[in-house]
Design a protein with these regions (language model features):
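Active-site catalytic microenvironments in core metabolic enzymes, especially phosphate/sugar-handling
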Residues: 3-10, 17-18, 122, 131-147, ...
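Ser/Thr- (and often Asn-) enriched beta-sheet segments in non-cytosolic proteins
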Residues: 65, 97-99, 158-160
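A conserved acidic, glycine/proline-rich C-terminal tail/linker
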Residues: 76-150
């Protein structure tokens, strides 16, 4: 759909939300193009649904998926909402056991502090925080969590956050 893409972005393949989807949506909403001009109709049986990992909350544990890697900083963004995490009744400064699996393989397990900002832990230390999407994030202060522990994203990457005894 080359004609429905922001001009001078033909060689850019990383910002389709901006260059293709938003641009085409704006043209469609403003009446500059019709549905037929967006592109060919896709058969319903060709639509692929991706699995969604459900968040599970148990007594002192919350489980979810690692959905997004913030590539600029190496932070992990999870499917666990702020409200789901709050079921563990966290206070800033509390420590939690964080366990990460790739399918069934253990990739990471350690105690991590819950903080307001990265400054709540020493440089090089991991931190649990609430990101701008109100989801649980996991990072290293001034480092890349993803690179340090070779963590990826997707429905096969699972995270467990367990409240430690007081």
């Amino acid at each position: 759909v080359t004609s429905n893409r922001r001009s001078n972005t033909e060689l850019s393949y990383t910002f389709h939300g901006r260059d293709v989807y938003a641009y085409t949506g704006a043209k469609l909403a403003s009446g500059h193009i019709s549905f037929e001009e967006v592109g060919p109709e896709l058969p319903v049986d060709k639509i692929l649904e991706l699995p969604v990992v459900e968040t599970i909350i148990e007594d002192n544990l919350v489980r979810g998926a690692i959905d997004i890697l913030d590539v600029r900083f190496g932070s992990l963004w999870t499917s666990i909402t702020r409200d789901d995490f709050y079921a563990l009744e966290p206070n800033f400064g509390d420590r939690f056991e964080v366990t990460i699996f790739n399918n069934d393989m253990l990739v990471y397990q350690n105690q991590v502090t819950y903080g307001k900002s990265f400054a709540d832990v020493r440089i090089g230390q991991p931190i649990i925080y609430i990101n701008s999407l109100y989801r649980v994030g996991l990072a290293i202060n001034q480092g890349s969590f993803a690179k340090a522990y070779n963590v990826g994203v997707g429905s096969n990457w699972h995270i467990e956050i367990k409240r430690l005894g007081d």
